[in-house]
């Protein structure tokens, strides 16, 4: 099979690149091995949350200019970041992932443990604050589904009380939710979202909430609605008498699953091909270019393309792997930026910046991958497979995924 572009990896960066290229009229195929790290998504997208010293960033576009030369943002070019950030927001909203935010100034989202964390874009309806030290309400009621353990209400309440809010924790249930509770494996956020997918179930939830809620400025609920779109989140707001807002839960993330579904739908509408549950396992190189790739489920048929994008993720997604001797990229054995000695991969203190978090595929300034010291002219790397940054310490992971994908897609479309 022959395509214009083949993308290896169906996560945030792979889908972003695929959508952008399909919109430009390219014939695109995405090879996706399985579920991506979007299933751990917070409901927010991060451009740059903390600087290199660990201090919260208020104005990310200004702080990005202080990052090192090997950071993916530096390779993009600091002068392009604002434009690409706007394009990323437009793409998400076009896919149906309704977000709000501003690349010029971070707002603050809530973690599932009640901490406030800098964020660039946040899903509509999720609880945010414009400032780090003020809350938009005084009296808060935190409402949880009975038996749902992935929404630690006591931690959230303690965090809000420290910031001056008067908090009450309450719970509710319905017959449908009570039935789901019989099996602990069914009390995950994504399973609850499926149980509450129809209007009748949603009406029962609203009636329960109206019955137990008191005199609060806002009702904070776990984000367990809207598995495939945001309709139920908005609909519940019209049914409940008090203002409500949603807080993220522990994984799996309903918002992340919904984001993946909506991006895949847009990619399919644009005519893209998605090979789901297949894994790229190698490629043929000739004269400094990648000619074709092979996959586990198509052992007798190579996939050919003019351009290739590696968006396979980091260690969690098996885009990077390691053994006792080395860190390596498993599909093409590309050059990797990593320490040679295993003892240097980690620090003894778990709270220190861990060196392995900055490991990734080595690229040139245009994100061409490098193999055996030589640039591969038609193979690009994007997203969390890239080296040069620590997404946990800098809180820039989703921003790097979105913006590097957009930049590489632009580079490819400008070649013709």
Language-model features: where?
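FAD-binding beta-loop-beta segment adjacent to the flavin cofactor pocket
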Residues: 299-300, 336-341, 345-391
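A conserved FAD-binding loop/helix module that cradles the flavin
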Residues: 318-325, 377, 385-416
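N-terminal Rossmann-like FAD-binding beta1-loop-alpha1 element of flavoenzymes
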Residues: 3-30, 409
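Conserved N-terminal glycine-rich FAD pyrophosphate-binding loop of Rossmann-like flavoproteins
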Residues: 33-69, 176-192, 399
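Short hydrophobic core segments
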Residues: 6-8, 31, 280, 303-313
């Amino acid at each position: 099979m022959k395509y214009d572009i083949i993308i290896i990896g169906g996560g945030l960066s792979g889908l972003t690149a695929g959508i952008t290229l399909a919109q430009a009229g390219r014939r695109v195929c995405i090879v996706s091995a399985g579920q991506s790290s979007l299933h751990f998504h917070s409901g927010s997208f991060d451009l740059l949350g903390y600087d290199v010293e660990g201090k919260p960033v208020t104005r990310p576009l200004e702080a990005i200019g202080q990052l090192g030369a090997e950071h993916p943002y530096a390779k993009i070019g600091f002068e392009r970041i604002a434009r690409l950030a706007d394009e990323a927001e437009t793409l998400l909203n076009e896919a149906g992932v309704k977000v709000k935010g501003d690349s010029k100034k971070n707002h603050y989202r809530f973690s599932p443990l009640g901490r406030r964390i800098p964020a660039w874009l946040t899903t509509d309806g999720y609880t945010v604050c414009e400032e780090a030290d003020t809350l938009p309400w005084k009296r808060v009621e935190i409402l949880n589904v009975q038996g749902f353990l992935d929404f630690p209400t006591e931690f959230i309440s303690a965090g809000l009380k420290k910031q001056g809010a008067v908090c009450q924790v309450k719970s509710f249930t319905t017959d449908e939710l009570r039935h789901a509770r019989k099996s602990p494996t069914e009390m995950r956020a994504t399973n609850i979202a499926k149980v509450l997918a129809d209007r009748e179930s949603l009406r029962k939830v609203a009636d329960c909430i109206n019955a137990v809620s008191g005199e609060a400025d806002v009702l904070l609920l776990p984000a367990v609605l809207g598995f495939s779109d945001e309709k139920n989140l908005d609909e519940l707001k019209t049914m409940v008498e008090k203002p409500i807002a949603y807080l993220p839960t522990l994984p799996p993330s309903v918002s992340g699953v919904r984001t993946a579904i909506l991006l895949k739908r847009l990619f399919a509408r644009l005519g893209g091909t998605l090979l789901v549950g297949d894994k790229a396992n190698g490629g043929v190189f000739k004269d400094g270019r990648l000619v074709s790739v092979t996959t586990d489920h198509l052992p007798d048929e190579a996939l050919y393309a003019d351009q290739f994008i590696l968006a396979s993720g980091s260690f969690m997604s098996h885009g990077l792997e390691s053994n006792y001797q080395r860190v390596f990229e498993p599909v093409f054995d590309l050059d990797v930026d990593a320490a040679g000695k295993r003892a240097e991969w980690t620090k003894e203190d778990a709270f220190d910046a861990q060196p392995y978090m900055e490991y990734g595929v080595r690229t040139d300034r245009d994100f061409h991958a490098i193999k055996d010291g030589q640039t591969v002219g038609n193979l690009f790397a994007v997203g969390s497979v890239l080296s040069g940054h620590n997404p946990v310490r800098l809180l820039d992971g989703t921003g790097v995924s979105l913006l590097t994908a957009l930049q590489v897609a632009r580079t490819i479309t400008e070649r013709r």
